[in-house]
C-alpha cells in the first residue's frame, strides 16, 4: 500500500482521537450542571481557574457574549447608596490600572489633572455621546444649559461659580457659570451654538442623519439613477473582504447557524431547539414521564438512530432528505460528528472550535449531559447512559437538515460552507446588502428597501441589478460624511461630553477656553480608554474594598476582646455548627444569650462521610462533600424493643406511598382511573388546596399530625459499629458501619482540624443543618454544601454516637485527645428555613446531664427566635418590627407556603470567611455574611500541616458557594436560572424558562436578588510565614481534566483572584493582604480611623434596617472574662 493510501486509511482514526480530545476539553467552558437532586454550589466558571478572574471574565465574554460583572447602572446605584465611595474607587483605580492612573493629562492654573480624575468621573457619570434627539431632550427637559449636571461635587460647583464672579462681580450665578462653560466648549471645537427652536432642532437631526442626495433619493422612492459615489471595483473589494472575514469566523466565533443568521436574520436554533430538547428530555428523564424511549438503555445517540419520531411528536417531515440522511448515520456518535462536519464542509482545522461553538450555544443542556457523561455510576445512567459526543452528533444532524432547508429555499444551493462562500463570491452585491441589513446598522429607508427585495421570489432576488442598486445606496450612505458623524466633532457628541466633564472636574469656562482642540480630544479619548471589562473589574474591586475596610477594621478593633482564645475556664456547653454563613447569626445570638457558651464552626459533615439510608429510605444517598467518595454505609434501624411496632409502621408507610403513587401518576397517565379518582377525591383535594393557599402553616401542621397518626413514628438507632474483619472498605465495597479504628481516626482528624482537642464542656452539641420548604425544585441548593447538598443531621448524630463510646475515647486518649467522663455529645439538626432544631437520641443522655440540657435547650430556643427575627429584616413580605414569636411564625410559614419563591435567602450576601479561633470574631456583628471556620494555630505545627488541609478542602467549597451566588447575581439571565415563577421542571433533573428554553443552571433570581456579588475575602489566623510556606507548597498550575476541577487547586484560586486571601497575626492582630506578585502586604486603611459602634445586642444594631449593616461590636450585659489571643 502506498504511503498516501496508508495516510488516508489512518486519517479517520486520527480524526476520531482528535474529536474525542476536543470534546473532553469542552468541560473547560461548560457549566458543571448537576441534576436538581444533586445540585451543588460550584464556580460557574470552573473551567477558567487556570487564568485570572479578570482574564476569565474577558475570555468568557468574547466566547459567549455574557458579561460577568454587574451592569454599570447597578454599580452606580450602589455608589449612590454609599456602598461604594470615592475613596474606594480611587484605591481600585490605583491598584488595577498598572500605574496609568498617575499620568498627568494637563495642568489648569497649576492644578494637575491626571487620568484617575477623568476615569473616576467616567465611571460615576454617564458621559457618553448623545443622539441629536437626546441632546435636544437634555436642553429642553433638564435645562442642561442653565443648571449644573447631577452629581457635580460642591467643590467643583464653587470653583465654577467663583470663576464667574471673578470675571463679573455682579454675575455670580449658576446659569451664567454654565453658559460661560458651554460657550467655551463650543469655541474649543469651533462649532456654532444650536440655539434653535425645537422644530428647527428636529430638522437639524434629519440633516445630520441623511445626506442631501440620500434625502432626495428617499423622497423619489430610491430612483435607480442615483449617481455612484464610490467606484464599483472598490465597492466589490470591500464586500469581498467582508465576506471572507465572515466566513473565516466560522469555527471559532460563529457556527453556520450564526453565519446564516447574519445573512437571513433567521435563527435556526429556534427550529432546532424544540426538537433537540424534547428528545434529550425524554432520554434523560428521571421519573417524570409515563413512557420511555425505546433503546434508551443503549445510549443517547443509539436511541436517536432508532427514534420513532412521529410518536415522540418530532416533526421532521418538512425538512428535505432527512430520512435518507438519518438512515445513513453511522453506528458510533463520533463517526456521525465527522460525517456532519464533512457534510457542512467545515475545514478540519476548525473542528474543535466549531464543536465548542455549538456546545456553548445551549450550555445548560451540554453541561448536564457532560456531567452525566463523567459520572457513569450515577443511578439514572444505568437506564439511560449518555455522552457529550452523542449530544453533539444529534445537534449536528439537526443543524445539517435545517441548514439544507434554508439554503435550498433561499438560494437553491446545498447547505455547506463552501457552497455559501462560492455563491456569495458570485453575488457580492446581494451579500453586501444582506450583511448590512442584518447587522442592524441601516437607516429605516434603506432597511425597508433591502427587506422588500428579500421578500421577492428567489429568481427576482438574483437580479444583479436590483441588489447592485440597493448595495450602491448602502455604500453611498456608509461613506457619506454625514454617516461618519461619530468621527466628526459635533455639538451633541464632543461639545456635550467636554461640557459635562469640565463641570465634574471643576474647570470653568475661562480655563476650558484655553484648551486647544487636540487637548480637548485627548481628554475625551481618556474617557473611553478603559475597556468594558476593565471598567467592570475596577467597579468590582471598589465594591469589595468598601466591604474589606469595614471587615478589617472590625477584626482589628476586636482583637483581644473575644472569649475562648484558650479554654482555661470550662464553658457551660459547646456547640459545633457548620461553618455556613447562615449559622453565623445563631452562633452570635447564642453567645449573647449566654456568654458562657462556646460555639465552633466546621464542615457540616463533621468529618464523617457516609452513604446514608434512613429508616424509610429505599436507597442510600451520599452525605459528604462532592469531591469525597464514602467507603462506609450507615443505616438507621428500629431499636430492638420497637421491632414489632416497626412492622406496622413499614406496612402503613408502604401503603401511604402506594396511594401517593396512584394519586400522582394515575391521575396524569390513565384516562379511566384519572376520571374516577378526580370525581371521588375532588372535595377533599379542594379542601387541601384551600388550606395550602390560605392557611399554609396550619395545613402543614395538620398534615404532620395526620401522618404521625396514620404512620406512627418508631424510635430508631444507628447501625454504627461493626467488627474489623480485615477487609478494606472501598467505594466499590462499602462497609455497613464503622470499625473502632475508623471511628477513632475520623474523630481525631476532625477535632484537630477545628482546634478542639481539650477543654471539653459537659455538653457538646453537633448541629448539622438543612432546609425544608414546599414546591421548591432547587431544594438541595439550600441544604448543607459540605454534606453534598443533603442534610447534615445524620452525620452529626453519627459523630455524637461515636464520641460517646468509651472504646473510642480510649483510642482518642492514646492520640493525646482526652475527653472527660463527664462530657456528653448530642447530635442535632438546624432547619435554616423554619428555625426548628430537632435533637437526636435524647433518651440516651445520662440523667445527671438533665438540668444542664434543659437550660441549654431553652437558650437554643431563645437564639432561634432571635435568628428568625434577624432574618425577617431582609424579607420584603415579613412583618416590620415583629415580635420574636411573630418572626419565628413567619419564617416557619415561608417553608410551608407552596407559593413562596423565597422560603429563605440561602447564602445571599455572603462575602467573607474567617479561619481561626472563635476569639477573633466573637463579639462582632457580621450580618450573616461570613463563613466562620474554627482552627487553632497554637496546636498546629510550624509547617501549618493542619491549616494546609483546612485550606485545601474548605477553601474551594467556600469559593464554589460564593462564586455561584456571585455570577447568578451579577448576570442572572446569563449565569442563573431566571425567575422561579416562570420555571418549568424538566424530567425531574432541571428547570427551564418556558417549554423550549436552554436548561437553566445555578441560582434562581429569587435566591440572589438581595445578594451583593463580590468574591469571598478569606482571613486566616496565622502568621504570614506559615501561609506563604503553604502557598509555595501548592502546585503552581493544573489544567482541569476529567472532572477534577470540582476541587480546584488552592494556588490557582489564590493566584487568579478567585479567592482573596489575608492573614491576621495570632498574637498581634495585625492584618496582611496577599498579592500573588508581592506576597503579603501589611494592611493600612485608606480611610480615617474611627471606632466601631458598640451595642448591647445584635438587635440594637440591625433592627429597623433592611439593607446590609456594617460590622459593630457587641457587648452583652453580662461581663465576659477576657483572654488575650
UniProtKB/Swiss-Prot annotation:
Gene Ontology MF terms in the entry = zinc ion binding
What cofactor requirement does the entry state?
Answer: Zn(2+)
Question: Localized where?
Answer: Cell inner membrane
Q: Where does this protein hold Zn(2+)?
A: 578, 580, 769, 784
Where does the record place the region Disordered?
A: 1106-1125
Regarding the membrane, this protein is recorded as: Peripheral membrane protein
InterPro entries found in the cross-reference section: DabA
Q: Give the family, as the similarity comment puts it.
A: Belongs to the inorganic carbon transporter (TC 9.A.2) DabA family.
Under which name does UniProt file this protein? Probable inorganic carbon transporter subunit DabA
The cellular component terms of Gene Ontology attached to this UniProt record, alphabetical and capped at eight, are:
plasma membrane
Q: Subunit structure of this entry?
A: Forms a complex with DabB.
One Pfam short name: DabA
State its role.
Part of an energy-coupled inorganic carbon pump.
Domain of life, per UniProt, equals Bacteria
Question: Which UniProt keywords are present, listed alphabetically?
Answer: Cell inner membrane, Cell membrane, Membrane, Metal-binding, Transport, Zinc
Amino acid at each position: 500500500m502506498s504511503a498516501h493510501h496508508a495516510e488516508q486509511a489512518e486519517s479517520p482514526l486520527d480524526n476520531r482521537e482528535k474529536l474525542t480530545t476536543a470534546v473532553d476539553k469542552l468541560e473547560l467552558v461548560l457549566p458543571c450542571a448537576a441534576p436538581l437532586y444533586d445540585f451543588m454550589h460550584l464556580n460557574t466558571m470552573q473551567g477558567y481557574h487556570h487564568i485570572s478572574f479578570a482574564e476569565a471574565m474577558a475570555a468568557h465574554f468574547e466566547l459567549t457574549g455574557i458579561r460577568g460583572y454587574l451592569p454599570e447602572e447597578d454599580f452606580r446605584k450602589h455608589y449612590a447608596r454609599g456602598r461604594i465611595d470615592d475613596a474606594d474607587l480611587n484605591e481600585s483605580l490605583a491598584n488595577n490600572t498598572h500605574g496609568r492612573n498617575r499620568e498627568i493629562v494637563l495642568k489648569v492654573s497649576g492644578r494637575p489633572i491626571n487620568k484617575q480624575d477623568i476615569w473616576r468621573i467616567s465611571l460615576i457619570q454617564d458621559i457618553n455621546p448623545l443622539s441629536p434627539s437626546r441632546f435636544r431632550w437634555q436642553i429642553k427637559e433638564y435645562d442642561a444649559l442653565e443648571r449644573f449636571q447631577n452629581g457635580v461635587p460642591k467643590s467643583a460647583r464653587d470653583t465654577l461659580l467663583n470663576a464667574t464672579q471673578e470675571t463679573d462681580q455682579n454675575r455670580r450665578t449658576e446659569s451664567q457659570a454654565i453658559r460661560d462653560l458651554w460657550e467655551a466648549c463650543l469655541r474649543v471645537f469651533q462649532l456654532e451654538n444650536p440655539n434653535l427652536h425645537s422644530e428647527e432642532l428636529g430638522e437639524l437631526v434629519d440633516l445630520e442623519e441623511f445626506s442631501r442626495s440620500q434625502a432626495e433619493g428617499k423622497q423619489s422612492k430610491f430612483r435607480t439613477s442615483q449617481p455612484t459615489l464610490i467606484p464599483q471595483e472598490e465597492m466589490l473589494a470591500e464586500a469581498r473582504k467582508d465576506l471572507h472575514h465572515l466566513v473565516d469566523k466560522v469555527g471559532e466565533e460563529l457556527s453556520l447557524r450564526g453565519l446564516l443568521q447574519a445573512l437571513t436574520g433567521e435563527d435556526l436554533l429556534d427550529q432546532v431547539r424544540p426538537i433537540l430538547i424534547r428528545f434529550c428530555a425524554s432520554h434523560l428523564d428521571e421519573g417524570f414521564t409515563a413512557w420511555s424511549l425505546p433503546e434508551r438503555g443503549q445510549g443517547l445517540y443509539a436511541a436517536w438512530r432508532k427514534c420513532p419520531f412521529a410518536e415522540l411528536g418530532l416533526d421532521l417531515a418538512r425538512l428535505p432528505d432527512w430520512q435518507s440522511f438519518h438512515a445513513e448515520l453511522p453506528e458510533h456518535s463520533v463517526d456521525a460528528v465527522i460525517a456532519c462536519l464533512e457534510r457542512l464542509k467545515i475545514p478540519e482545522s476548525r473542528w474543535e472550535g466549531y464543536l465548542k461553538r455549538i456546545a456553548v450555544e445551549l450550555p445548560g443542556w451540554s453541561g448536564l449531559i457532560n456531567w452525566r457523561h463523567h459520572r457513569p455510576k450515577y443511578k439514572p445512567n444505568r437506564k439511560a447512559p449518555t455522552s457529550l459526543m452523542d449530544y453533539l452528533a444529534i445537534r449536528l444532524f439537526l443543524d445539517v437538515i435545517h441548514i439544507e432547508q434554508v439554503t435550498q429555499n433561499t438560494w437553491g444551493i446545498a447547505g455547506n460552507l463552501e457552497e455559501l462562500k462560492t455563491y456569495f463570491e458570485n453575488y457580492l452585491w446581494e451579500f453586501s446588502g444582506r450583511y448590512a441589513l442584518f447587522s442592524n446598522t441601516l437607516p429605516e429607508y434603506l432597511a425597508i428597501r433591502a427587506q422588500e427585495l428579500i421578500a421577492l421570489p428567489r429568481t427576482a432576488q438574483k437580479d444583479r441589478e436590483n441588489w447592485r442598486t440597493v448595495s450602491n445606496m448602502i455604500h453611498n450612505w456608509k461613506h457619506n460624511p454625514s454617516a461618519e458623524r461619530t468621527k466628526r466633532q459635533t455639538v451633541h457628541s464632543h461639545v456635550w461630553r467636554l461640557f459635562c466633564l469640565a463641570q465634574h472636574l471643576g474647570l470653568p469656562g475661562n480655563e476650558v477656553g484655553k484648551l486647544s482642540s487636540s487637548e480637548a480630544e485627548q481628554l475625551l479619548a481618556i474617557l473611553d480608554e478603559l475597556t468594558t471589562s476593565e471598567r467592570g473589574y475596577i467597579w468590582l474591586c471598589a465594591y469589595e474594598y468598601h466591604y474589606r475596610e469595614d471587615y478589617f477594621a472590625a477584626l482589628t478593633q476586636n482583637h483581644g476582646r473575644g472569649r475562648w482564645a484558650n479554654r482555661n475556664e470550662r464553658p457551660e456547653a459547646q456547640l459545633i455548627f457548620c461553618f455556613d454563613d447562615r449559622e453565623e447569626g445563631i452562633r452570635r445570638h447564642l453567645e449573647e444569650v449566654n456568654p458562657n457558651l462556646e460555639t465552633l464552626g466546621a464542615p457540616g459533615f463533621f468529618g464523617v462521610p457516609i452513604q446514608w439510608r434512613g429508616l424509610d429510605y429505599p436507597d442510600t444517598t451520599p452525605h459528604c462533600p462532592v469531591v469525597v467518595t464514602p467507603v462506609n454505609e450507615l443505616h438507621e434501624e428500629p431499636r430492638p424493643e420497637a421491632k414489632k411496632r416497626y412492622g406496622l409502621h413499614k406496612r402503613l408507610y408502604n401503603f401511604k406511598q402506594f396511594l401517593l403513587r396512584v394519586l400522582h401518576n394515575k391521575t396524569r397517565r390513565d384516562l379511566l382511573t384519572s376520571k374516577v379518582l378526580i370525581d371521588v377525591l375532588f372535595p377533599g383535594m379542594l379542601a387541601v388546596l384551600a388550606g395550602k393557599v390560605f392557611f399554609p402553616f396550619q395545613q402543614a401542621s395538620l398534615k404532620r399530625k395526620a401522618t404521625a397518626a396514620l404512620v406512627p413514628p418508631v424510635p430508631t438507632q444507628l447501625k454504627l459499629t461493626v467488627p474489623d474483619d480485615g477487609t478494606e472498605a472501598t467505594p466499590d465495597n462499602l462497609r455497613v458501619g464503622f470499625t473502632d479504628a475508623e471511628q477513632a481516626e475520623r474523630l481525631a482528624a476532625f477535632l484537630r482540624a477545628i482546634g478542639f482537642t481539650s477543654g471539653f464542656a459537659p455538653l457538646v452539641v453537633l448541629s448539622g443543618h438543612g432546609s425544608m420548604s414546599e414546591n421548591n425544585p432547587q431544594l438541595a441548593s439550600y441544604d448543607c454544601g459540605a454534606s453534598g447538598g443533603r442534610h447534615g443531621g445524620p452525620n452529626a448524630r453519627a459523630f455524637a454516637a461515636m464520641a460517646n463510646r468509651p472504646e473510642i475515647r480510649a483510642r482518642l486518649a492514646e492520640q493525646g485527645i482526652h475527653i472527660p467522663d463527664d462530657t456528653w455529645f448530642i447530635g442535632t439538626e438546624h432547619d435554616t428555613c423554619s428555625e426548628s432544631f430537632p435533637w437526636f437520641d435524647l433518651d440516651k443522655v445520662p440523667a445527671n446531664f438533665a438540668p444542664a440540657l434543659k437550660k441549654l435547650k431553652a437558650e437554643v430556643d431563645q437564639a432561634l427566635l432571635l435568628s428568625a427575627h434577624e432574618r425577617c429584616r431582609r424579607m420584603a413580605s415579613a412583618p416590620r418590627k415583629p415580635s420574636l414569636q411573630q418572626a419565628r411564625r413567619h419564617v416557619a410559614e415561608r417553608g410551608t407556603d407552596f407559593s413562596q419563591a423565597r422560603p429563605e435567602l440561602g447564602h445571599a450576601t455572603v462575602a467573607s470567611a474567617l479561619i481561626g479561633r472563635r476569639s477573633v470574631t466573637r463579639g462582632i456583628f457580621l450580618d450573616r455574611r461570613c463563613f466562620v471556620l474554627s482552627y487553632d494555630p497554637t496546636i498546629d505545627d510550624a509547617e501549618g500541616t493542619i491549616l494546609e488541609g483546612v485550606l485545601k478542602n474548605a477553601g474551594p467549597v467556600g469559593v464554589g458557594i460564593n462564586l455561584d451566588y456571585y455570577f447568578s447575581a451579577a448576570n442572572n439571565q446569563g449565569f442563573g436560572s431566571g425567575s422561579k415563577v416562570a420555571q418549568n421542571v424538566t424530567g425531574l433533573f432541571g428547570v427551564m424558562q418556558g417549554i423550549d428554553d436552554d436548561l437553566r443552571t445555578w441560582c434562581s433570581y429569587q435566591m440572589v436578588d438581595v445578594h451583593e456579588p463580590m468574591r469571598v475575602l478569606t482571613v486566616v489566623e496565622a502568621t504570614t510565614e506559615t501561609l506563604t510556606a503553604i502557598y509555595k507548597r501548592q502546585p503552581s498550575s493544573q489544567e482541569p481534566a476529567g472532572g477534577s476541577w470540582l476541587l480546584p487547586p488552592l494556588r490557582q484560586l489564590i493566584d487568579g483572584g478567585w479567592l482573596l486571601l489575608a492573614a491576621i497575626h495570632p498574637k498581634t492582630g495585625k492584618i496582611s493582604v496577599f498579592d500573588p506578585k508581592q506576597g503579603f502586604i501589611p494592611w493600612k486603611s485608606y480611610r480615617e480611623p474611627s471606632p466601631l459602634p458598640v451595642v448591647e445586642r445584635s438587635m440594637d444594631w440591625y433592627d429597623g434596617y433592611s439593607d446590609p449593616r456594617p460590622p459593630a461590636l457587641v457587648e452583652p450585659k453580662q461581663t465576659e472574662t477576657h483572654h488575650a489571643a
